[in-house]
Design a protein with these regions (language model features):
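ABC-family nucleotide-binding domains
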Residues: 162, 168-169
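Q-loop/switch helix immediately C-terminal to the Walker
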Residues: 90, 95-111
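Hydrophobic anchor residue at the start of the ABC signature
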Residues: 148
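Conserved ABC transporter NBD signature motif
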Residues: 64-75, 79-80
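Conserved ABC ATPase "signature" region
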Residues: 115-131
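A short, flexible loop at the N-terminus of ABC-type nucleotide-binding domains that lies
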Residues: 1-30, 34-35, 77
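Helix-to-loop junction immediately C-terminal to a conserved catalytic motif
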Residues: 56
Length: 212
C-alpha cells in the first residue's frame, strides 16, 4: 500500500517569482500539489487568484518552473495547459456560447471529459433551465455553476477554482461541497481551490497559506 510519502505530486512549482508591484508577490515560491484537494487561503490582496493564474500557465512568471506529470510549462506550454482546467470567474470570452456549447468545447479540449457524468452535474447544480441560454444571459451564480460542471466533468489532471461557492444558492453550495468531498478521497486528480477557509468537511491534501 502506498503511503502519502510514496504518492507522486501531480504539479510541481519550483522557485516561482512574480512581481508587478513592490515588493514581489512571490519570491522563490515552491510547492508540491498532491492528488486531492489543496486549499489556497490568505487575506485580501495576498495573491490567491494570481497564484491560480500562475499555476494555470496564463499569467507569465518572472522566474521559476512549473511541471504537471513531468510536462514543463516553459518547454511544452501547449501540452502543459492541456493538463489544466482554469476558467477566469469573471471571464466574458465564452459569453456568446450557450452552456451546452461551452460543455462541448470543453469535451473537445479534454480527452477524458465524461459526458455521462455531466447530466448529473447539470441536475445537481440546478442548471437545467439554463443550458440552452447564451452565457451572457446568465447570472453570476449560474455562470459559476457552468464553470463548476465543466470542471468536475473534465478529468483534467489539475483543476483550479477561484472561490468555488461565490454567488451560489444554498442547494448548489451543498452539492459542490459533496463533489469536493468525493474528489478529496478518490482518484488521481489534483484540485486547487482559493477560499478564505477550509470548505466544509473536505479533507485537504495540502494547504497553501499566503498569510493575512
Amino acid at each position: 500500500m502506498k503511503t502519502p510519502c510514496d504518492t507522486p505530486a501531480v504539479l510541481l512549482a519550483d522557485k516561482l517569482h512574480f512581481q508587478y508591484l513592490e515588493p514581489a508577490l512571490f519570491t522563490n515560491f515552491s510547492v508540491r500539489v498532491m492528488p486531492g484537494v489543496t486549499l489556497v487561503c490568505g487575506g485580501s490582496g495576498r495573491g490567491k487568484s494570481t497564484l491560480l493564474r500562475l499555476l494555470a500557465g496564463v499569467q507569465p512568471l518572472s522566474a521559476g518552473q512549473l511541471h504537471i506529470h513531468g510536462i514543463c510549462l516553459q518547454d511544452e506550454p501547449e501540452a502543459y495547459r492541456q493538463q489544466v482546467l482554469w476558467t477566469e470567474p469573471r471571464s466574458t470570452v465564452f459569453d456568446e456560447l450557450t452552456a451546452l456549447q461551452y460543455f462541448e468545447l470543453q469535451r473537445r479540449t479534454y480527452g477524458g471529459f465524461t459526458t455521462s457524468h455531466l447530466a448529473g452535474l447539470i441536475k445537481g447544480l440546478n442548471l437545467e433551465p439554463h443550458v440552452n441560454k447564451p452565457l451572457y444571459m446568465l447570472s453570476t451564480g449560474s455562470k459559476r455553476k457552468v464553470w463548476l460542471a465543466a470542471a468536475f466533468a473534465s478529468s483534467a489532471a489539475v483543476t483550479l477554482i477561484d472561490e468555488p461557492f461565490a454567488a451560489l444558492d444554498t442547494d448548489s453550495t451543498g452539492f459542490a461541497l459533496q463533489l469536493l468531498e468525493d474528489a478529496a478521497t478518490h482518484g488521481a486528480r489534483a484540485w486547487v481551490i482559493a477560499h478564505f477557509e477550509q470548505p466544509g468537511k473536505v479533507a485537504l491534501a495540502g494547504r497553501i497559506d499566503l498569510g493575512d
